[in-house]
């Protein structure tokens, strides 16, 4: 009886692992169907009690695996651009731009996961699938991300994603008007405007 219980437990663990692997494979294959796209988005941030912290909106351009432009237009403008090697963050309000190597950027943020869509990243998560919804929980609890949810159709269109941090703050993004196809290469370059202070951390 004891051997049977142990065997059942082992098989159960194997089945769960296979389900997670299948979900990760399906998620990656769906995202692989669209190599580049543009979409507008709305943002809603709530605290651990569900109280509204911030509402925002902006535009997003992606060309996988490493080119992207995340342009927040409201409530405050900010720009996050990757040219494939350098990651630029620009805040027009304080007139400051920061440059870091993309390879040094954390890969455990929802946007980086979506933009990169690399198997090595997805392997860091336990993934459960319910139709078009994928719920990701980090295997390591050392980071700030507690849970990540993404809704992506079979055609690769991302409808929404959200992230819950360790303090239960939730950031939800609703994507709309996703246009799949070629994106102007200029969207993935950034030149600091004249007079802007540059914090270059690529050293």
Swiss-Prot record:
Record keyword ATP-binding present: no
Domain of life: Bacteria
Signal peptide: 1-21
InterPro entries: LolA/LolB/LppX (IPR029046), OM_lipoprot_carrier_LolA-like (IPR004564), OM_lipoprot_carrier_LolA_Pbac (IPR018323)
GO biological process: lipoprotein localization to outer membrane; lipoprotein transport
Keyword Signal: yes
Entry keywords, A to Z: Chaperone, Periplasm, Protein transport, Signal, Transport
Main location: periplasm
HAMAP family: LolA
Family: Belongs to the LolA family.
Record protein name field: Outer-membrane lipoprotein carrier protein
Organism lineage: Bacteria, Pseudomonadati, Pseudomonadota, Gammaproteobacteria, Enterobacterales
Encoding gene (name): lolA
């Amino acid at each position: 009886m004891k051997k049977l219980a142990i065997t059942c437990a082992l098989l159960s663990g194997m089945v769960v692992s296979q389900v997670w692997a299948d979900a990760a494979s399906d998620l990656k294959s769906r995202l692989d169907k669209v190599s580049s796209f543009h979409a507008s988005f709305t943002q809603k941030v709530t605290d651990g009690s569900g109280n509204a912290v911030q509402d925002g909106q902006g535009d997003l351009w992606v060309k996988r695996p490493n080119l992207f432009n995340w342009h927040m237009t409201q409530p405050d403008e900010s720009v996050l651009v990757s040219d494939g090697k350098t990651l630029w963050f620009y805040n027009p309000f304080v007139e400051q731009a920061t440059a870091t190597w993309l390879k040094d950027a954390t890969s455990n943020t929802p946007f980086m996961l979506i933009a990169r869509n690399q198997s090595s990243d997805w392997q860091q998560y336990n993934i459960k699938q319910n139709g078009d919804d994928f719920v990701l929980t980090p295997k390591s609890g050392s980071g700030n991300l507690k849970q990540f949810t993404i809704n992506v159709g079979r055609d690769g269109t991302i409808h929404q994603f959200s992230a819950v941090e360790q303090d239960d703050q939730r950031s939800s993004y609703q994507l709309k008007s996703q246009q799949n196809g070629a994106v102007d290469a200029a969207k993935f370059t950034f030149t600091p405007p004249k007079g802007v202070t540059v914090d270059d951390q690529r050293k």
